[in-house]
């Protein structure tokens, strides 16, 4: 039971808190991914957004490669490390970019867009490991039928930026 409780505390609750942060502030601000089509195409200039999107694409590549080798442990550990970075680095440093006290801006929209994209893709990667949690978050975010009916994500190598990742590792 101790291992299960530790996993719940260190991973499931952390992921749920990231999701809760996003939906709370996005709802308060009236942000809706379906209404953001033009804004979603904007070039993202924020280094935090570039960093987490780089990490996300690296995660897609790592999880895909690990699962192709039937190494579920390596894949799950990579996801766990990513969720920790997402919570302890991206969310903590992006808190002042969102919320009702922050004026509407492209940076605010970029933060919501980035977090939305990260959570949707993360649900697809999580589906083989935590199917019910991934389904709950995915359906609440997208309104889609099921995360299990979606295509597996493909890493966009042009989004992987090792320089930004190195700089963040030094921070």
Where are these regions (language model features)?
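Feature marking long nucleic-acid-engaging regions of large polymerase/nuclease enzymes
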Residues: 2-3, 7, 20-21, 27
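Aromatic-lined ligand-binding clefts that engage carbohydrates, nucleic acids, or primary amines
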Residues: 80
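Conserved phosphate-binding loops in nucleotide/dinucleotide-binding enzymes
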Residues: 1-10, 68-69, 73-75, 158-168
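Acidic, turn-prone loop/beta-hairpin segments
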Residues: 12, 29-36, 43-64, 92-171
């Amino acid at each position: 039971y101790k291992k299960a409780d530790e996993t719940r505390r260190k991973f499931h609750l952390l992921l749920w808190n990231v999701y809760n942060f996003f939906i709370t502030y996005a709802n308060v601000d009236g942000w809706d991914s379906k209404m953001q089509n033009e804004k979603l195409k904007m070039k993202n200039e924020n280094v935090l957004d570039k960093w987490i999107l780089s990490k996300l694409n690296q995660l897609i590549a790592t999880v895909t490669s690990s699962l192709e080798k039937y190494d579920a442990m390596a894949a799950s550990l990579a996801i766990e490390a990513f969720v920790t970075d997402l919570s302890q680095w991206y969310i903590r440093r992006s808190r002042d970019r969102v919320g009702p006290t922050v004026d509407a801006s492209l940076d605010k929209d970029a933060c919501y867009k980035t977090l939305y994209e990260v959570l949707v893709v993360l649900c697809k990667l999580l589906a083989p490991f935590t199917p019910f949690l991934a389904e709950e978050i995915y359906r609440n975010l997208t309104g889609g039928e099921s995360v299990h009916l979606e295509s597996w994500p493909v890493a966009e190598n042009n989004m992987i930026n090792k320089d930004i990742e190195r700089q963040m590792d030094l921070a």
